[in-house]
Design a protein with these regions (language model features):
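Short beta-strand elements bearing conserved aromatic residues within extracellular beta-rich modules
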Residues: 46, 219, 625-629
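A short, amphipathic beta-strand motif
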Residues: 27-35
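Ser/Thr/Pro/Gly-rich low-complexity disordered regions
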Residues: 581-687
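Non-catalytic cap/lid and distal C-terminal segments of serine-dependent acyl enzymes
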Residues: 52-94, 100-583
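Classical eukaryotic N-terminal signal peptides for Sec-dependent ER targeting/secretion
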Residues: 1-13
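Short, ordered, surface-exposed loop/turn motifs in non-cytosolic proteins
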Residues: 39-50
Length: 687
C-alpha cells in the first residue's frame, strides 16, 4: 500500500497500517467477573485499552489522535465463572479472535482498563436473529455505555517478555438518573420540560413489531416566544433539525448557548453594529431522539437492518406531535435541515417523502452519490482502502496553509472500528453506513460492501446500496409515477465546502452533476464554497440569518405566498422508501432467497463418458469457496478452490461400473458460520 502521493500525512498515518497483535511480546490479559455483577450468561464485546500511564483510558479514543493501544474480542455466553483471555491477534479470525489498533511494541508503562459491551438477543419480525447492544438514553457510545461492565483502571508496566495481566469486571455503568415523566424508562432518555423546551416520547408500534421488544422514539420541541398551548388558532411552521444524539439539548444551541437562548426566549434578536432589534422568526424547531442498535441515531429512514425508523418518525411521532402542539401540519410548513449525518437525513427525508415535507436545507451531507462515498469511487474501485495506483484513500483530513493533511485513512478508520465490534456493530461511522445503506447478510447482520480487513469491494453487495444512493434514486424516479423531476424541482438546498474534512464535497458534486444535468442548473440549489471545511449552518450563515431564510421560504410557499407549493407536488404517489419494499428487497427473506445450492447440470441418471458440468451455487458476496467431489457418499480427490459463477467440470473414469456423484461446496467468510452445501445427486453408468 502506498502511503504518500503528494499529500501530507499526519504522524499517526506515516507508517502504513498493519494489524496489531497483543501477543507480539507473549502478553496475555485475563479478565474475570466479580460476584453479583452478572444475572446470567451474556454475549458481548470486550474492549481492552492501554493508555499512557496516568491517563484516563477513555480520555481520547478517537482514530485521529488517540495515544492508546486498543484491543477487542467477542465473548459468547460469558458467565460468573468464566475468564476471557486476550492474546495474539490478527486479521483472519475477527469473529472469535483479537482485533487491535494500532501496531506498536507493547513494552512500556500504562493505565489499563477493560470494558464489556453486552449484547441482547433480538429476533426480528422477518425471521432474522441478531445479538446487539440496545442503547438506553446514552446515545449508543462505542464503549462504556449504559449496562457495560468495567474493570478498575490499573497502572502497570508491560515488560516486553512473557507476562500475564489479570483484571476483573467489578461494576456496571448505571442508567442516567430520570428527571422527566416520559414513558419507556431510559430508552431515548428521560427529561423534564422547561417553559420553552418540551419533551415527548412514544412507543413505536412499528419498531416494536419489527424488533420483538418495546422500542421508542422521542423529540425535543423548542417553542417560540409567545406560544400559547390553548390558542389553537395560532399555529406555527416546523423546522425539523436532524442531528446525532441530542440528549436533552434543544436545537441550535438552545440551553447551551446563552445568547441564542436569551434571544429565543424573548423572541427578539438583538441588533448589532447600530442596527435595531428585530423579531425572531416564529418557528417550532424539533430535534428527534432516535438512538438505535447500530448508532446514536437511525438515519431517520426505513432500512432492512434497523427497521421502520422512517415510518416510526413520520407516521407515528410527527402525527403525535401535531396532535399535542400547535403546528401547521402541511408540507409547505415542514422543513428539514441538518449537517453531516443530519444533512443526509434531511435530504433523504424530503427526497423519500415529498408528500410530507416542503424543502430541505442540507449542509455537508453524508454521501449523496456513491460514485464518491467520501473519497471512495464505490461503483468502480476494486478496493475501498486504496486506488488502482496503490495510493491510500483518506477518510479524515485537515488543511494547513491550503495543503491537505490526512489524519486517518479509510483503512485505518475501519480497522479502528473493528476494535469496538464485528459484523458492523461498532456503533461508529462506517459500520452504521453498512446498516443504513445495505441489505441484510445471511448471518442477519449488514451485508458489508467490502472486506473490513483487506478493503476488497464486493460489487454485488454494493448493488444493494443503490436505493439509498439519493442521486441514483432521484434519477431512477425522474419521470415515472413518482415524477420526482417535477415534484422536487426547487425544493432541495445543499451546501458543502471544497475542503470538507470528511471528503463529503465529492458526493455533493456528483449529486449536483446528476440531478442538475437532468433538470437544469437551478433544479437543485447546490452551493459548493471554495476553501470551506466541515461545519456551520447552511452556507455558513449566522444562525438568525439562516432561520429567517427558512422562515421566508415557508412564507413564500404558503397558500398565500408568492410561489405556493402546489398540492400536485405533494401527492402520496411521490412517496418512496416504503418499508414493505425495503424489507422485501433486503431483509432476511431476501437473503435466504438469493442463496442457491451447487448444481450438476445433467439429469438424475447419465451414461459414463460425457463431462459433467457443475456450478458452485450462489452465496453472499465475499464468501470463499472450496469444493470437493463426492463419489458414492465418500470424498474423491483433493479440495479445490472455486468462485461463484465458475463452470466446474468432472470427467467420469472407468474406475466405477456405476456410481453416484455430487459436488460439496464449503463457504467461509468473516463473521459467518462455515457452511457446506451439497448439490443434487446424479447416477453415472458406463456405456
Amino acid at each position: 500500500m502506498t502511503c504518500f502521493s503528494g499529500i501530507r500525512w499526519a504522524s499517526l498515518v506515516v507508517a502504513c497500517l498493519s494489524w496489531a497483535a497483543l501477543g507480539s511480546d507473549n502478553l496475555r490479559v485475563q479478565i474475570s467477573v466479580g460476584d453479583n455483577i452478572l444475572k446470567g450468561n451474556i454475549d458481548g464485546r470486550v474492549v481492552l485499552i492501554f493508555a499512557p500511564n496516568g491517563t484516563d483510558p477513555l480520555e481520547d479514543t478517537d482514530v485521529t489522535s488517540t495515544p492508546n493501544k486498543m484491543f477487542g474480542k467477542n465473548v459468547f455466553q460469558f458467565g460468573d465463572n468464566d475468564i476471557v483471555t486476550l492474546s495474539g491477534g490478527g486479521p483472519n479470525n475477527t469473529a472469535t479472535g483479537v482485533s487491535g489498533f494500532p501496531l506498536f511494541s507493547m513494552a512500556g508503562t500504562y493505565r489499563v482498563q477493560a470494558f464489556l459491551n453486552p449484547y441482547n438477543k433480538a429476533r426480528r419480525s422477518d425471521g432474522s436473529e441478531v445479538y446487539l447492544k440496545f442503547p438506553c438514553g446514552d446515545g449508543a457510545p462505542n464503549v462504556d455505555g449504559v449496562g457495560s461492565l468495567t474493570t478498575p483502571a490499573m497502572d502497570l508496566e508491560v515488560h516486553g517478555g512473557p507476562q500475564t495481566i489479570k483484571l476483573t469486571f467489578d461494576s456496571v455503568v448505571p442508567v442516567e438518573a430520570f428527571v422527566g415523566k416520559e414513558i419507556g424508562g431510559c430508552s431515548q432518555g428521560n427529561y423534564a420540560d422547561t417553559e420553552r423546551l418540551k419533551y415527548v416520547k412514544i412507543r413505536s408500534k412499528k419498531l416494536s413489531e419489527f424488533w420483538g421488544r418495546d422500542m421508542y422514539v422521542g423529540a425535543n420541541i423548542l417553542l417560540p416566544a409567545g406560544y400559547n398551548a390553548a390558542d389553537k388558532h395560532t399555529r406555527y411552521p416546523v423546522l425539523y433539525d436532524q442531528n446525532h444524539w441530542t440528549g436533552g439539548r434543544g436545537a441550535y444551541g438552545y440551553s447551551t448557548n446563552a445568547a441564542f437562548t436569551a434571544a429565543w426566549d424573548k423572541g427578539i434578536i438583538p441588533g448589532t453594529n447600530g442596527a435595531p432589534d428585530r423579531p425572531a422568526p416564529k418557528l417550532i424547531i424539533i430535534a428527534f431522539r432516535h438512538e438505535a442498535p447500530y448508532y446514536d441515531d437511525s438515519y431517520g429512514v426505513n432500512t432492512a437492518n434497523m427497521g421502520p425508523y422512517g415510518d416510526a418518525i413520520n407516521e407515528e411521532l410527527i402525527p403525535y406531535i401535531d396532535e399535542k402542539f400547535n403546528t401547521i401540519a402541511q408540507p409547505y410548513a415542514r422543513i428539514q435541515d441538518g449537517g453531516s449525518t443530519g444533512g443526509w437525513i434531511s435530504a433523504a427525508s424530503l427526497i423519500f417523502r415529498p408528500d410530507l415535507f416542503g424543502a430541505c436545507f442540507s449542509s455537508y451531507p453524508d454521501s449523496l452519490d456513491f460514485n464518491s462515498h467520501q473519497a471512495i469511487p464505490l461503483y468502480t474501485n476494486k478496493n475501498a482502502y486504496q486506488n488502482a495506483d496503490g495510493d491510500s484513500i483518506g477518510s479524515i483530513r485537515t488543511f494547513e496553509n491550503n495543503t491537505e493533511v490526512v489524519l486517518a485513512t479509510v483503512a485505518q478508520e475501519n480497522h479502528w472500528e473493528l476494535v469496538f465490534g464485528t459484523s458492523s456493530r461498532s456503533s461508529l461511522q462506517w459500520d452504521v453506513w453498512n446498516a443504513v445503506f445495505g441489505a441484510q447478510g445471511l448471518n442477519g447482520y449488514p451485508l458489508e460492501p467490502w472486506d473490513k480487513v483487506t478493503g476488497e469491494i464486493y460489487p454485488e453487495a454494493v448493488e444493494y446500496w443503490k436505493p439509498m444512493d439519493l442521486s441514483n434514486y432521484v434519477a431512477s424516479n425522474w419521470n415515472n409515477t413518482k415524477n420526482l423531476g417535477e415534484v422536487l424541482r426547487g425544493r432541495i438546498y445543499i451546501y458543502v465546502g471544497t475542503h470538507d474534512n470528511y471528503y463529503l464535497n465529492g458526493g455533493v458534486a456528483a449529486f449536483e452533476k446528476q440531478v442538475n444535468g437532468l433538470g437544469g442548473p437551478n433544479w437543485a440549489n447546490v452551493t459548493i464554497t471554495p476553501g470551506q471545511t466541515h461545519g456551520g449552518n447552511y452556507q455558513r450563515r449566522e444562525t438568525w440569518d439562516y432561520l429567517q431564510l427558512v422562515y421566508n421560504w415557508i412564507q413564500d410557499h404558503s397558500p398565500k405566498g408568492t410561489t405556493p407549493l402546489s398540492t400536485k407536488f405533494t401527492k402520496p404517489s411521490s412517496r418512496g422508501n416504503k418499508f414493505e419494499d425495503v424489507i422485501q428487497a433486503g431483509g432476511h427473506g431476501a437473503a435466504l432467497k438469493r442463496q442457491q445450492k451447487p448444481t450438476l447440470s445433467y439429469k438424475q441418471s447419465v451414461k459414463c463418458g460425457p463431462t459433467i458440468k457443475a456450478t458452485a451455487g450462489r452465496w453472499d458476496p465475499g464468501v470463499t469457496l472450496q469444493a470437493q467431489w463426492i463419489v458414492n457418499g465418500r470424498p474423491s480427490g483433493a479440495l479445490f478452490a472455486v468462485k461463484q459463477g465458475d463452470l466446474i467440470n468432472y470427467s467420469p473414469t472407468a474406475k466405477y461400473q456405476r456410481f453416484e456423484l455430487k459436488l460439496r461446496v464449503t463457504g467461509t467468510k468473516r463473521n459467518y458460520e462455515d457452511e457446506a452445501r451439497d448439490s443434487n445427486i446424479i447416477v453415472i453408468g458406463r456405456r
